[in-house]
């Protein structure tokens, strides 16, 4: 989301100090009391750095004036805090969550819980916290779409149904729900590099 929305690029390095101070209460990286230091997006994914993605969630919530003040911002956000809106960031996160199929059930043939895309706190939601609520099958469909560069499939537990003689009665071929088309090849490359 951050790469596609332009709040970071593949050459952007963001600091992890172990504690993120631009919002209160101050969320912590999983490595706290240590820190990861400066990371690019591939390294942020590789190390699963909370602080990196807290900052992405924060930047998603900035208006254009706030964006222009990032170069002079401090670790506590004094230069940008007046231009931050969690609702603005949440709207962007929700848009991409929907594109990747997280707003719907996975398509399996059994009952499953309805998903909940976070509607609260863009900073925490950027690392999957907030009010997100998904089943493992919904997350599996999402990560499959990330791995295959944007094809979202409806999941199936069945391959085929056969009669007693082994003849196929019904074939369950993979069904494409949608394709995510607004992600650049550079973004896919950076994400996949981080996931290796």
Where are these regions (language model features)?
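Beta-lactam-recognizing serine transpeptidase/beta-lactamase-like catalytic domain environment
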Residues: 2-196
């Amino acid at each position: 989301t951050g790469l596609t929305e332009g709040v970071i690029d593949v050459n952007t390095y963001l600091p992890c100090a172990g504690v993120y101070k631009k919002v209160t209460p101050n969320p912590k990286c999983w490595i706290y009391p240590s820190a990861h230091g400066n990371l690019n997006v591939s390294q942020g994914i590789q190390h699963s750095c909370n602080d990196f993605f807290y900052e992405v969630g924060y930047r998603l919530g900035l208006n254009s004036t706030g964006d222009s003040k990032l170069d002079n911002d401090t670790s506590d956000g004094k230069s940008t805090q007046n231009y931050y809106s969690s609702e603005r960031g949440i709207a962007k996160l929700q848009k991409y969550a929907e594109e990747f199929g997280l707003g719907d059930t996975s398509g399996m043939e059994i009952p499953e819980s309805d998903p909940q895309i976070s509607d609260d706190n863009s900073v925490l939601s950027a690392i999957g916290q907030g009010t997100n609520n998904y089943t493992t099958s919904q997350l599996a469909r999402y990560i499959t779409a990330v791995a295959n560069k944007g094809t979202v499939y409806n999941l199936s537990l069945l391959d085929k149904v056969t009669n007693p003689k082994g003849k196929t009665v019904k074939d369950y071929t993979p069904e494409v729900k949608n394709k995510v088309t607004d992600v650049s090849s550079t973004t896919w490359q950076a994400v996949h590099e981080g996931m290796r």
